[in-house]
Amino acid sequence: MGQPRKSRKKYNTPPHPWNAERIKNENKLMTKYGLKNKKEIWKADTLVRRYSREARYLLGFDMDQMQDEKLELLGHLARTGVLPEGAALEEVLNLTVEDILRRRLQTIVYKKGLARTPKEARMFVVHGHITLNGKKINSPSYVVLKGQEDEIGFYPSSPVAKQIEEYNKNKNEKATEE
């Protein structure tokens, strides 16, 4: 845990700074998910590596204590929506950075159609236009649990909410006419 005054970084940087293929893949992820910087990708990558490391550790044991820890890890990943319910421990080893990035509040706001682009979704979250269970969430990197997806919406007094809902209504009307 460390000292409260000395906060530690939550990510590991890439081993080599100028790998062209890695940089190209990171740039694609940044545009696809509307990320601010590559640090957000590295945080997700560190999470994936942490889950994989724990899964490899647990695959080597068959004791009752380890069985409880397996269920705890799989339950956590199922609650967050990274893995489906009833997934095997071996499936944790196949996780990718995109699996983690899909569960961010910013991405889900975009996928639900509350924003036109991932960058706009990020702006709505940061500016306090988005609520989860009636509470403002200002962090675009908030990991949305599986059961919370339907509770995402605009803040009732948000000036943007009416404009976006009107835009979506007009868009749906045009789609039904065609």
UniProtKB/Swiss-Prot annotation:
This is Small ribosomal subunit protein uS4. The keyword Transferase does not apply. Residues 1-11 have a biased composition (Basic residues). Part of the 30S ribosomal subunit. Contacts protein S5. The interaction surface between S4 and S5 is involved in control of translational fidelity. GO terms for cellular component: small ribosomal subunit. Gene3D superfamilies: RNA-binding S4 domain. It holds the Pfam family S4. It comes from the Archaea. Residues 103-170 form the S4 RNA-binding domain. The gene is rps4. Residues 1-20 are annotated as: Disordered. Belongs to the universal ribosomal protein uS4 family. One of the primary rRNA binding proteins, it binds directly to 16S rRNA where it nucleates assembly of the body of the 30S subunit. With S5 and S12 plays an important role in translational accuracy. GO terms for biological process: ribosomal small subunit biogenesis; translation. Keywords: Ribonucleoprotein, Ribosomal protein, RNA-binding, rRNA-binding. HAMAP family: Ribosomal_uS4_A. It comes from Methanobrevibacter smithii (strain ATCC 35061 / DSM 861 / OCM 144 / PS).
